[in-house]
Amino acid sequence: MQCAQYTAGHCHSCQWLNKSYSQQLSDKQQHLQQLLRETSATYWLPPVSSLISGFRNKAKMVVSGSVERPQLGMLHRDGRTVDLCDCPLYPQYFQLVFESIKIFIAKAGLVPYNVARKKGELKYILLTESRASGEMMLRFVLRSETKLAQLEHALPWLQEQLPQLTVISANIQPTHMAILEGEKEVIFTEHKMLKEIFNGIPLYIRPRSFFQTNPEIASALYATAGRWVRELNISSMWDLFCGAGGFGLHCADKETRLTGIEISAEAIACAKNSAKSLGLEQVEFQALDSTHFALDKAQLPELVLVNPPRRGIGKALCEYLSRMAPKFILYSSCNAETMAKDIAALEQYRIEKVQLFDMFPHTEHYETLALLIFDGK
């Protein structure tokens, strides 16, 4: 992949851009195999490769510059700004969307926030696309509510220019710290969420819910999880750290008793919408802490699926699963190092199969899916 910003030394977010893509995949696979060398897997499946450009469905842009000539991109620690509207990780048509947003920022008088001076209003724009429909969600992250009326008044022009923007909102983030979003969300449109479809499964994206940024690989990851689980012929499962329900909904059928747990109420609302659309009556989603939920239960289902944040599932949940010994654990991870530590702590389990999914090309990061089977006495 060619990137003018990388070549010019303006952006090095893609740390591995100087490696061939085949070398990137090989290095990631070797890294994963080294991490799991003490817990040998029965089956190592080949890594799932990604598109190398145009694969991202979400842009998180720092807004800088002036209200007349805003920039959308990133802010270096030394205060330098870089416009990344031509970033090749996004589909090319995102550039036209960004240009219209820049014009709108000027029309609406949304002064970019100046970090050094602690002045201005508009901090970020967050753009997400549904690949299924082409519809988009646009969020303006503002320092205060001062410009809300001004923003809303100017919206008809933006909606005329970009009719694919079906969800538009403002998030209020008043603190000076480098926090992407705040607690308050103001939605300006009739539609409150985007609908995405992976493998025939409807999934929903609300403004403050997490969703994977590489839809092709996310779709393959969910489909693989569903296929592995169906081969086990189970009737009950938990989906811990379930997000918008992508994993559990791919694994469950109308007979499966599925409980999905996620701390984010926004994500749980999305998961419930999906389950309702699919007519899954034995599926339940709850907005709770996954570890606290599990530790409170005296009985476990046949399979526990975990998809934790980068820190892993942690000591308490590892000890609980070791003690309660569900027959299967399906572990999905965005941090293979913490996953390897967790698996090492699950001493009574063996890895039946493991596969790498290249969710983040041109970086050292990747997703892993591992099926663990209880092998204790």
Curated annotation (Swiss-Prot):
Keywords from the UniProt entry: 4Fe-4S, Iron, Iron-sulfur, Metal-binding, Methyltransferase, rRNA processing, S-adenosyl-L-methionine, Transferase
SUPFAM superfamilies, A to Z: S-adenosyl-L-methionine-dependent methyltransferases
The keyword RNA-binding is annotated on this UniProt entry: no
Claim: Metal-binding is one of the keywords in the record: yes
A GO term for molecular function: 4 iron, 4 sulfur cluster binding
Catalytic reactions on record: uridine(747) in 23S rRNA + S-adenosyl-L-methionine = 5-methyluridine(747) in 23S rRNA + S-adenosyl-L-homocysteine + H(+)
Pfam family of the protein (one): tRNA_U5-meth_tr
Domain of life (superkingdom): Bacteria
Binding positions for S-adenosyl-L-methionine per the UniProt entry: 212, 241, 262, 307
InterPro entries, sorted: 23SrRNA_MeTrfase_RlmC, MeTrfase_TrmA_AS, MeTrfase_TrmA_CS, SAM-dependent_MTases_sf, U5_MeTrfase_fam
Assigned protein family: Belongs to the class I-like SAM-binding methyltransferase superfamily. RNA M5U methyltransferase family. RlmC subfamily.
Name the UniProt record assigns to this protein: 23S rRNA (uracil(747)-C(5))-methyltransferase RlmC
